[in-house]
Amino acid sequence: MSSGCRSVGGSTWGNWRGDGGDLRQRRVLSPVCSAPAAGSWIGSQLGNVGNLLATPHPLGKPASSRVGTIVLACLLLFGSCVVRAVPTTPSPPTSTPTSMSTHSHGTVDPTLLPTETPDPLRLAVRESGILAEDGDFYTCPPPTGSTVVRIEPPRTCPKFDLGRNFTEGIAVIFKENIAPYKFRANVYYKDIVVTRVWKGYSHTSLSDRYNDRVPVSVEEIFGLIDSKGKCSSKAEYLRDNIMHHAYHDDEDEVELDLVPSKFATPGARAWQTTNDTTSYVGWMPWRHYTSTSVNCIVEEVEARSVYPYDSFALSTGDIVYASPFYGLRAAARIEHNSYAQDSFRQVEGYRPRDLDSKLQAEEPVTKNFITTPHVTVSWNWTEKKVEACTLTKWKEVDELVRDEFRGSYRFTIRSISSTFISNTTQFKLESAPLTECVSKEAKEAIDSIYKKQYESTHVFSGDVEYYLARGGFLIAFRPMLSNELARLYLNELVRSNRTYDLKNLLNPNANNNNNTTRRRRSLLSVPEPQPTQDGVHREQILHRLHKRAVEATAGTDSSNVTAKQLELIKTTSSIEFAMLQFAYDHIQSHVNEMLSRIATAWCTLQNKERTLWNEMVKINPSAIVSATLDERVAARVLGDVIAITHCAKIEGNVYLQNSMRSMDSNTCYSRPPVTFTITKNANNRGSIEGQLGEENEIFTERKLIEPCALNQKRYFKFGKEYVYYENYTFVRKVPPTEIEVISTYVELNLTLLEDREFLPLEVYTRAELEDTGLLDYSEIQRRNQLHALRFYDIDSVVNVDNTAVIMQGIASFFKGLGKVGEAVGTLVLAAAGAVVSTVSGIASFLNNPFGGLAIGLLVIAGLVAAFFAYRYVMQIRSNPMKALYPITTKALKNKAKTSYGQNEEDDGSDFDEAKLEEAREMIKYMSMVSALEKQEKKAIKKNSGVGLIASNVSKLALRRRGPKYTRLQQNDTMENEKMV
């Protein structure tokens, strides 16, 4: 300690004098005998005390003041020598005061050795500091130039492009035609039914039944059906190479009228010659009886055929294995036909007959007839290209936008929220089969839309273009231009004198699409060479080759070859992919537009900010480079480059001193002084004194000073909070929430995606899907179930209540007569209903089995009664007296005689002759009356005047003839006499 004091109090201190005059009482100095700590400001000042004493005062003060200063310094140094040694670095307090420290000077520093005692001055300095509770602090060494960087030069900003070649127009979308080709056909056949019945003694049974259909000959169709509306009862058919004949009812051939069927399906009409099936049963039992029924049937049904139209089906269930477009013309001979040539017949100018109205058609047609083993089919022939089409119209689009993107066209249709993608090359309709209808329908639909909506505002800029989109949709598109844009084009053409190029300017894609395919060369395209004398051999060869090419083309059907090479367009059953494509394109366009605008704006802003960075780095290179690298660095400009060093994070404690005044009374620190340790748990000897920089940066030196000013107020960021100094003295901590924030950021205003609803669309309706098959099975099933009811015993199946119809007619008649007539009609209908009900009841009773038995018994009883009546009548005719008056018989006479005591052998001489004569007269009179009644009835029946006159005369004669009949007495005189 003495040596330290002597070294300090040597010649070095002899010339020292203070810089600021008298020391202030609140300034604390810590003279230390030992070597000062590294980085200590007091130690550095004491170490340079000799220099301070040797340096003359700038104000040129007298030597007497210097001597006083030297004496005061010696006293201070002498006092410090007698103090015990203390650590050079103060230990941090256990607690961080928020204001001026009020701790006792008797606190013992735990970092001191047991033999050491704390320095009160150092404890005062230490306890007057503020510990940083949170936040990261960094210390940055000065850059030396070992690491240099430069600022990137300006970039080229991208330019955003919405698309290329946007074109608006009208379009018609076609889809695959899955519906069959439908037409009407007539079916002619004779239904033959051969029945075999066994006749027993008391029963009849059906032992066999043969049913077959045979075709009607074409000659019979011409001569009878379509000429007279009749059909023959004879049927000829070939079975097992044998010609068979059948006759209706097993009788001779006759012509029968064709009558409408009583029961027909909605999609067909039918006519036949009979409704009943003949079943003959003879009178002789124990035999088989065979009968034949021939029913001539004509049906008008619906026929269907699907691509490639090599056959067609009828609603009767029959399939004809020939194309409906087959014919004898040149273009129709190539169609498919599986039947022999003699089975087919085509008639030009044919006029069929309507079997309902019995009238022939006014316009002649071309009729085809095909005879199959069971039926003859006829239909009207039409050209294939006119009737059949493999594509059908799906949607008419009145607003469509086409844009070119990455070598493809995108057709956007907002009305159905769909986007279709196709190649930029137009689709040739000739490459697909049977597409002649597309161009016609597309042109008509586009012209109709244009006249309704765009005729006054737009003009067409090209012809109809065809594109095959993904999914099998054919788009017929015709581009348009608004009138204003068309005028601009015309003005540009007139200005550049290119009026001949108007079409190419309005539609620049027309030439590209039309010239994309190279025309194939052929010998047919070479003109026929003319032989010359100079090159006869060469010309002959060319002539021969040309002729072979023509013959090959003529011999091989061009349509058939083309049909093999053509490919049918297949369309998907859903357009969900197109709707998703529309949604994706919509989102993609919006997002890409926003991102591209952001990228362009960001790049432009970066280029502008780069200039600002380049200028600001000259002012504060460390802050600029740290913000650029997003890392704490220390920087220094070295010409056109920047030298940097990386900052180290302070892991130890940082203490902020509560005073910003330096030892000079006129000089103060511009940033607060701090004391810190690099690592944690460091002792007092490892503490470093520095100065607080910006953004929690710690300087290892205290070089930031300024002249002291009055009413000074400063806020400094210390950790995560701010500290407030007033007049270079710490006042309090300030939370960040008490300080209002001003934002330097530019808000990015982005537009949200607009709502887009997906519309449910059906490419094929349920009716179309149900109608795709070759056969309508519901129609076939209905027809087959009703076939028997349609032609056989229809009267026993279809019961029509004629009584109800008659009653309804009578009721309508009486109802038209007014209220009185309606009342009378009610009574009449009630009575008639009772009668009808009675008759219906009797009929129902007769149809009942018990009723039939009762009727049989009644018939037998009637026969017995008739037999006895017949015997009685015969008895009257043979012996009327005996029959009418049995008392006159011989038995009665004998009985009477016996009663009077006479024998049977006695004669009848005692019989009363008068009574007998009266009886004879009575019988005679009765016979005359009977004859007279018969004569009168005949006269009345014949309405003959002569007979009536004769009858009246006979009546007069009978009235005047003879005495009148007198009644016999009840008692016999003989009996009376006997009783007396």
Swiss-Prot record:
Q: Where is this region: Disordered?
A: 1-20, 88-118, 505-535
Q: Which UniProt keywords apply?
A: Disulfide bond, Glycoprotein, Host cell membrane, Host endosome, Host Golgi apparatus, Host membrane, Host-virus interaction, Membrane, Signal, Transmembrane, Transmembrane helix, Viral attachment to host cell, Viral envelope protein, Virion, Virus entry into host cell
Q: Which residues form the signal peptide?
A: 1-86
Where are stretches of biased composition, namely Low complexity? 96-118, 505-516
One Gene Ontology biological process: virion attachment to host cell
Q: Region Hydrophobic membrane proximal region: which residues?
A: 794-847, 823-843
The highest taxon in the source lineage is Viruses
Keyword Phosphoprotein annotated: no
Region (Involved in fusion and/or binding to host membrane) residue ranges read 197-203, 282-290
Tell me where the sequence motif Golgi targeting sits in this chain.
Answer: 925-928
Q: Does Transmembrane appear among the keywords? A: yes
Q: How is it modified after translation?
A: A proteolytic cleavage by host furin generates two subunits that remain linked by disulfide bonds.
Query: Which cellular component terms (GO) are annotated to the entry?
Result: host cell endosome membrane; host cell Golgi membrane; host cell plasma membrane; membrane; viral envelope; virion membrane
Residues spanned by motif Internalization motif = 965-968
- The record lists glycosylation at N165, N275, N380, N423, N497, N514, N515, N560, N727, N749
Disulfide-bonded cysteine pairs: these are C140-C647, C157-C603, C231-C296, C389-C437, C668-C708
Q: How does it sit in the membrane?
A: Single-pass type I membrane protein
Tell me which HAMAP family the record gives. Answer: HSV_GB
Q: What does this protein do?
A: Envelope glycoprotein that forms spikes at the surface of virion envelope. Essential for the initial attachment to heparan sulfate moieties of the host cell surface proteoglycans. Involved in fusion of viral and cellular membranes leading to virus entry into the host cell. Following initial binding to its host receptors, membrane fusion is mediated by the fusion machinery composed at least of gB and the heterodimer gH/gL. May be involved in the fusion between the virion envelope and the outer nuclear membrane during virion egress.
> What is the name attached to this protein's record?
Envelope glycoprotein B
The protein's gene is named gB
